[in-house]
Amino acid sequence: MPEPGKKPVSAFNKKPRSAEVTAGSAAVFEAETERSGVMVRWQRDGSDITANDKYGLAAEGKRHTLTVRDASPDDQGSYAVIAGSSKVKFDLKVTEPAPPEKAESEVAPGAPEEVPAPATELEESVSSPEGSVSVTQDGSAAEHQGAPDDPIGLFLMRPQDGEVTVGGSIVFSARVAGASLLKPPVVKWFKGKWVDLSSKVGQHLQLHDSYDRASKVYLFELHITDAQTTSAGGYRCEVSTKDKFDSCNFNLTVHEAIGSGDLDLRSAFRRTSLAGAGRRTSDSHEDAGTPDFSSLLKKRDSFRRDSKLEAPAEEDVWEILRQAPPSEYERIAFQHGVEACHRPLKRLKGMKQDEKKSTAFQKKLEPAYQVNKGHKIRLTVELADPDAEVKWLKNGQEIQMSGSKYIFESVGAKRTLTISQCSLADDAAYQCVVGGEKCSTELFVKEPPVLITRSLEDQLVMVGQRVEFECEVSEEGAQVKWLKDGVELTREETFKYRFKKDGRKHHLIINEATLEDAGHYAVRTSGGQSLAELIVQEKKLEVYQSIADLAVGAKDQAVFKCEVSDENVRGVWLKNGKELVPDNRIKVSHIGRVHKLTIDDVTPADEADYSFVPEGFACNLSAKLHFMEVKIDFVPRQEPPKIHLDCPGSTPDTIVVVTGNKLRLDVPISGDPAPTVVWQKTVTQGKKASAGPHPDAPEDAGADEEWVFDKKLLCETEGRVRVETTKDRSVFTVEGAEKEDEGVYTVTVKNPVGEDQVNLTVKVIDVPDAPAAPKISNVGEDSCTVQWEPPAYDGGQPVLGYILERKKKKSYRWMRLNFDLLRELSHEARRMIEGVAYEMRVYAVNAVGMSRPSPASQPFMPIGPPGEPTHLAVEDVSDTTVSLKWRPPERVGAGGLDGYSVEYCQEGCSEWTPALQGLTERRSMLVKDLPTGARLLFRVRAHNVAGPGGPIVTKEPVTVQEILQRPRLQLPRHLRQTIQKKVGEPVNLLIPFQGKPRPQVTWTKEGQPLAGEEVSIRNSPTDTILFIRAARRTHSGTYQVTVRIENMEDKATLILQIVDKPSPPQDIRIVETWGFNVALEWKPPQDDGNTEIWGYTVQKADKKTMEWFTVLEHYRRTHCVVSELIIGNGYYFRVFSHNMVGSSDKAAATKEPVFIPRPGITYEPPKYKALDFSEAPSFTQPLANRSIIAGYNAILCCAVRGSPKPKISWFKNGLDLGEDARFRMFCKQGVLTLEIRKPCPYDGGVYVCRATNLQGEAQCECRLEVRVPQ
């Protein structure tokens, strides 16, 4: 069952709707399922419908159709369609055809039956019953304008076609159901195919949206005002959510505005829509057709509705702007045609507005917050009412308590919302609502950069092979971009590239690589990128071992074997050019890269040319099979032994065998009686000696001498090396030939009649040994030179060439750099990535095959020199020096910068002289010791580990000669007036100047040279500084600075005023006293603090309290009258002086108090008997017994009185609680409170409150019971 409160998922994407048709027409109902291949049943009144003459059933992919032919009133009723567990019901209503009206009889065939109404009228019209559609007589249904409750897609109501006259306004509306959406839908409006209307919002086009919280329906509107003919055309509305998408197309027709004198009656009667074309308006008579009264009526309606023909109501735009919020000013101004709105809006902003102060919030939220993804954020407000309730909203919807994601805190007047584990879904607008007030903020969730933890690997493939690039990033679900040669690979190229995600792993797959796919591929994330190279080579088949000629005897086995580079390549065996068909005697095998042809029981018919042709390659491997026929001739008995070979004699051909292959020497022999066969192998070579001629050997001039060898007898009949002898032949076999088996073998046959001997030379060849590790040199930006030595042993065959491989140091994949063998012992490798460490290795190749790889070279990193520095300029020139400055090169590269070199040369000379030994890291330099008057060119080069980069040279020669410049002081504006500083403050006066050569600077004060350690002067080539660490009054005065070059000079005067607090006024005295008034007089202070006295402060103090109160402040005169004194009190008076620094530290005060007497009356205070208010403690409200629940704070209260204030003590079961931090005791206005924090059952017992003072003691007690919650 579906979960409660959730809508079950329907199996239909498109549901059939109820229809109303006329009798005799056909009704068509369509349904679309979520996936194809679903069994769908159609029912009427609970019974299944089958295909017959009445009902037509059709299914095409996801689309299923029911057609009711020749509908009659009997076909009315309830129908249903069922797919799986989903069932949708709909109704069919059949009506009698209406009689044709007279007006319609005059309309030509093909005229439209109804005139579409404008979109504004469609919205105001009353919709017909839910789900109904009107069906024409040809069976085509038109959707009703009303919105069905069960939407198709995401729309509740789709925007409809509309018409408007030029200058009019129209509104297109779309409603989207939001009950099942987790986030607000995103709606985009388009005109034509690609024009996004959000970029065209302005005076004539506006987009509005709203949300009805009660019905949970989103309303999106497109407002077009002052429509023009260019506004006509097709529009599209697209709505999308997280996992759903829907769109709707609609049209807007704009008619020309028709005045009362412009209406052409004849053209109005002409039909303006052509068959098979869109609507168009034409005033020419050539395009006119038959009269069309509906068109005339339509133009009449549009003429009446034309907004330009009606007098618009007067609107006070100024009043609307005054009542609107500032964010709506620009929209209202554009809407009412006010284009130059800057001055009115400026005036409106300048008007005084009564800003309403927030009464609910004391501290609001900040305008915006930012938090990293996965972190926690706290949003805090402070309320005016601590007991007020708050609501937190996210994008307008209230946040509910859900686990540990949202935490609501309330501490006093503070309200806090804590969001844990922030994700991108938390990036939203938040509001805190208190009553009718609210404050808003924006939360921005910042994603940490996605790093690449495993980089891409270089790959080398053949054409047609599968390529897969793989990388690993730091986060799952991260978005990555794949690029080829800097161009992003988009999803539109999925027919060639396939993108795959597996957790943190990302794959780029090319199913069949072509030559065009070669290049540099990169994967880019928000935190970096990784680059790899793909090299695609055309398929080229290499033959590691070719087939060889064979010579075998009858009934023997012949084996042809070859080895190629590609184990997937198949081939065909040919015999004399014809394909060889395998049978029981002839077998063909293919294991890995080895192809083998085996012929058992060889016969003379098998002697032929055999070839192996690989499929798909224009090459073949050929060999010949020789059949050795043994001829038996009749010989008399006592025949001497004879060895029958193809090359008899003392120098037979050398027999070559590959290491690991089987060596079989089949030697036919004859003799009677049967001879004895002896096989021997030469072990060591002896001395040279003369030898007699062999009896059967041909005469040869050079055959009179031969070498004498020490020989090893071979007589084993089993094992790896064995000898098998029969009557007519002797077979010498070596299983798995090795290097030690190489040498000269001697076959000797003997019988009583004589003997015969033959030497056979066997040579064992192998693949070469691995070369030594290659050496790397001439490392450049993307290239290097690789050098190596030949292998120590070439395998018995000359080395044909070498194969070079490289890999990234942190990778495990080696990539081949050449397919054609390298003949030289060096190679320049290119197309490497700068800044990536590489290793190289080399293979040696001979006729047998490829050697093992050499050890890897030392790691190296291709690094190119940096670019040339920029903006080289001459900063200063003197008689022997030139000051240069420049900026870093635009391209630094992976090698960084080690420094810069500076060189110079004479004009017209090509020899450059270094200006300094080594490099400098600074970007400026002073070149010294240059010849005066010389014209020199300067150049600067940047260096790194790869060497120097390109130089930058001064554009013109520089003449080494001092340029005389008149001295001039550039006195800052703030130093041209009196400089005021307080005592103790530092003084730092910087005065820039100009002049060449360097001017001489002189400071004087009052015409005297400056002296003393407190004032210091610091000079540089461009400015001078006067510095005083702590200013004193004696530093005040007039300073003069002079810069001089020979007989030229410039002066400037500075006035420094050091100010301090003034001294107190002098000679304060009381001039007169009368009534409630006192007249005071004093003299100005002796020291005014080196600045003007701003005023005085007069204070009075009552003799009884001696608390001073200010009477006059900032008073500028030296006499005053203090009024409103109290009769009978005595007063003291004092006066402070003030200047710009502050008030004087001391005041001038009157020595004797001034008494204000009551005239004529002497007051005698009454005598009273002193009362004793002391009282012993007593409890006015004793403690009461309580029963509380454990874990919740508890309070015990009582009230006590007594004088003097009694001392309070609390006890529990006789123990004093004053030292226990779990108990808090309060006393306010005689009310005593004991707070027990989170009590436990152990806190139960008898509590006593005791009050004690000098008059006595009192106490009260109660019993506290702590219950454990059930």
UniProtKB/Swiss-Prot annotation:
The gene is Mybpc3. Residues 151-254, 358-448, 449-539, 540-629, 641-767, 967-1061, 1177-1270 form the Ig-like C2-type domain. The modification N-acetylmethionine is found at residue 1. Residues 106-135 have a biased composition (Low complexity). The modification Omega-N-methylarginine is found at residue 1237. Coiled coil: none annotated. GO terms for biological process: cardiac muscle contraction; cell adhesion; heart morphogenesis; muscle contraction; myosin filament assembly; regulation of heart contraction; regulation of heart rate; sarcomere organization. The modification Phosphothreonine is found at residue 603. It comes from Mus musculus (Mouse). Residues 1-24, 94-152, 683-702 are annotated as: Disordered. The keyword Cytoplasm does not apply. Residues 94-105 have a biased composition (Basic and acidic residues). GO terms for cellular component: A band; cytoskeleton; myofibril; myosin filament; sarcomere. Belongs to the immunoglobulin superfamily. MyBP family. Keywords: Acetylation, Actin-binding, Cell adhesion, Disulfide bond, Immunoglobulin domain, Metal-binding, Methylation, Muscle protein, Phosphoprotein, Repeat, Thick filament, Ubl conjugation, Zinc. Thick filament-associated protein located in the crossbridge region of vertebrate striated muscle a bands. In vitro it binds MHC, F-actin and native thin filaments, and modifies the activity of actin-activated myosin ATPase. It may modulate muscle contraction or may play a more structural role. This is Myosin-binding protein C, cardiac-type. Residues 770-866, 868-963, 1064-1159 form the Fibronectin type-III domain. Zn(2+) binds at residues 206, 208, 221, 223.
